[in-house]
């Protein structure tokens, strides 16, 4: 029983860290983007640059994380990243200076990599070491919960608060999420044995496979960052859908909550690589649907497909990487 309680606390730490770094620090920007354009003078081009800078921060963090094998260092950087996620959130509300926003978005990208990659790696290591199934479906529900929560929060807060005040509310939420994200994740065990005394195996794929794999993952990331950042603005500009973009973002979050559990199930039956290919194909369809089909049906269907695949792809990739 104690082991199951500890398992749920570890998974809870991962969920709260993803809600903090991805949901608040990263994705609160998406539903707030139209509001910042209307109230803070943020131009469409500048909004795009901020999204690109955020992805550059994530990419920098991802490359850095890939070069780190020391569990203690991973744990330290993860915890620093969670604090940075809170600081970057408050930075967005303190000014209307583009360059301060740019620094905030870059650091938020680093923080999201700390949660997505370092935090997930630490949790995966704990699960394997304690002889639990090395699947991350419950853990990655945090991304969907964060997206859906931010979407609802912005819709409600916009009735009373301006863009700046909403960033400050998100900062308060981030402070609350920070506590379990740090407290419930135990310090890493650096031994080479599992809890039962079995050796920890590391069987990485070939260098050629990893080069092709990372190139494909990079392309998927580019498509993801554009769609995830601008989905609200894109839907708002489609004929007949003015003001309806927030519903698409909410659909993405709701679809993302159970997505990894579903893809874990699919991967057990088809293999992780086949499941990843299927998810990529469905994500392409989801990105194109709002434009090709049009209307609210196309927007919501596309959002559900996108939300149901992008987190699953990350989970599958990290599970394959071990």
Labelled PLM ranges:
Residues 134, 138-186:
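Helix-loop-helix hairpin linking two adjacent transmembrane segments in secondary transporters
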Residues 7-28, 207-223, 304-308:
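Pair of pore-lining "gating" transmembrane helices in MFS-fold secondary transporters
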